[in-house]
Amino acid sequence: MAVSPTTMAAVRASGAVPNAEYLLSAEGVRKEFPGVVALDDVQFRLKRASVHALMGENGAGKSTLMKILAGIYTPDKGDIRLKGIEIQLKSPLDALENGIAMIHQELNLMPFMTVAENIWIRREPKNRLGFIDHGVMHRMTEELFTRLNIAIDPDIEVRFLSVANRQMVEIAKAVSYNSDVLIMDEPTSALTEREVEHLFRIIRDLKAQGIGIVYITHKMNELFEIADEFSVFRDGRYIGTHASTDVTRDDIIRMMVGREITQMFPKEEVPIGEVMLSVKDLCLNGVFKNVSFEVRAGEILGVAGLVGSGRSNVAETLFGVTPASSGSIELYGKPVAISSPTEAIRNRMAFLTEDRKDTGCLLILDILENMQIAVLQDRYVKGGFVQQGAVEATCEDMAKKLRVKTPNLYERVENLSGGNQQKVLIGRWLLTNPRILILDEPTRGIDVGAKAEIHRLVTEMARDGVAVVMISSEMPEVLGMSDRIMVMHEGRVTGFLNRDEATQIKVMELAAQ
C-alpha cells in the first residue's frame, strides 16, 4: 500500500528512518505518452551517500524516469519507494516535502531577484510585523553557502551571475529543503573545465553528508570521475547497473546503443574545392578583432578555443545576427555585406546555434512547423500559396533520414529528447540546401549514438561539396572531424593547425596564448 506524501513527510520529519537498503528505488515503472512508450518495466535503485549516474541515448527514458521521481510525471504503473516505504508523488512539491529535489538542465531562477530571494522564495523568514526579514534571510543563505563551500554574495541579483554560479545557487536551493536525494540533469553542459572541478567538489561534499545523488550525463569521463555506479537505459527499457570501476568505456557504449560504434569520427578524405567563404580582418567592437580565415568546398574547418574566446560571436556575425564593425566577407568569390540571417539564408548559408532551446528550436511548435521555417519563403510557395503537401512530404523524408524518434511530425518539439531536438534543427537547415554550414557545438548534450550519426551527416555534407565551419569544445570531436583547426583566444585568432599535425597539446597551447 502506497503512503501519501504528507504521511511520508511526517515520517521523515520525525527522524524514524526505515532500515532500507536503498534510499530511493523504483520498480516495474511504465509510462506512456501518445504514440510512445517512454518507459517499459524499468527499475532504479539509489544508495545513501552515493552518486548514481544514468546513461543512455537520447530518448532512452532517463529524463522521464527522473521526472517521475521528482513528481513532475506520474507513472502509469510501478512502485516508488523512499527509504523502503512505498510513496505516491503527485507534484514537485510532494517530492520536495519528501526530500527529493531535481536540478534541471535549464535553470529555473528568477533573474531580477537576489540569490537569497531565489533560494527562500515562498519560504522567506518573517519579522514580528509579518514582513520579510532580509537580514535573517541573508544569514541563512550565508550559513547554507558555508556548508556547501560556495562563495557567492547572497544579495546580488541572479542576472549578474555566470551560468556556473547560477547552478551553485540551484544546488543550494535544493539542499535548503533538507533534501536526501538530488537529481542533476546534465549539470556540466555549459561549464568550463575549472567550473566542473568545483561542481564535483561540491558533489563529493554532499555525498559525504549522506545525500544520494542521481547524475544524468552523456559524458563518459564524468561517469568514471564522479559516479560510484551507473544504470543504462535503452529504448525505454532498463539494461543494467554496474559499479563504475568494473567496466570500460566500450562496455558502456555497447550497453547504451546495443551495437558496436566502429567509427565515432567517420572523417573521409574528400577533394577540397574552391574557396566558398573568405573572411578578412573581421572585427566586432569589444568582442573580437582582425579575424581572418577561409573555408573551401568539401572542407571542415574546426574552430577551437576556451569559453569566452569569441568563437560563437564570430559565427553569429557571419550569419548576420550581429553585423561586424569592420572587415570584409566574401562568398563564392564575391564581396557581400550580410546584415541579417535572412540575407545569409538567401546566400545559401546555414547556422546551427549552440543553444538549441533558446535560439534554435521553437519548443511549443511541432516538428513540421520547426523544420519548414527556413524554406517556406522559397521553393514551396507558388502564387502566394504554400504547397503544404510537398512541404510535409519533404519534411517526412528528412525526419526519416535523420532518424528522428517520434510518432509523427505533429509531435511538439518540447516533448523530444535533446538529441532529437538537435536533429530537427539540422533537418531544418539541410532543407535549405546550403553551400556553407556553420555548426556551433553540434553535439553538446547529445548521447554517443546521436553524436556518431551527426558526425556521419557532417561528413556526407562535406563529401557533397559543402564548406563546413564547426565550433566545438570537445577536443576529440575537433581533432577527429576537422581538415584544419583554427584556434581562438580572447577574441583573436592565435593559429591554424592542419589535420596531420594537430594534437590536443598543440591546440591547448594556442588556446591559452
UniProtKB/Swiss-Prot annotation:
Q: Please name every pair of cysteines joined by a disulfide bond in this record.
A: none
Q: List residues binding ATP.
A: G56, E57, N58, G59, A60, G61, K62, S63
Q: How does it sit in the membrane?
A: Peripheral membrane protein
Where is the protein situated, by its record's location annotation? Cell inner membrane
> Which Pfam families does the record match to this protein?
ABC_tran (PF00005)
Query: Is Thylakoid given among the entry's keywords?
Result: no
Ranges for domain ABC transporter come to 24-260, 270-510
GO MF terms here are:
ABC-type D-ribose transporter activity; ATP binding; ATP hydrolysis activity
Q: Which UniProt keywords apply?
A: ATP-binding, Cell inner membrane, Cell membrane, Membrane, Nucleotide-binding, Repeat, Sugar transport, Translocase, Transport
Q: Which coarse location class applies to the principal site listed for this UniProt protein?
A: membrane
Question: What cellular-component terms does GO give this entry?
Answer: plasma membrane
Query: Highest taxon of the source?
Result: Bacteria
**Which reaction equation describes what this protein catalyses?**
D-ribose(out) + ATP + H2O = D-ribose(in) + ADP + phosphate + H(+); D-galactose(out) + ATP + H2O = D-galactose(in) + ADP + phosphate + H(+)
The family database entries (InterPro entries) matched by this protein are listed as: AAA+_ATPase, ABC_carbohydrate_import_ATPase, ABC_transporter-like_ATP-bd, ABC_transporter-like_CS, P-loop_NTPase
**Which EC numbers characterise this protein's activity in its record?**
7.5.2.11, 7.5.2.7
Q: What does this protein do?
A: Part of an ABC transporter complex involved in carbohydrate import. Could be involved in ribose, galactose and/or methyl galactoside import. Responsible for energy coupling to the transport system.
Question: Which protein is depicted?
Answer: Putative ribose/galactose/methyl galactoside import ATP-binding protein
Biological source species:
Rhizobium johnstonii (strain DSM 114642 / LMG 32736 / 3841)
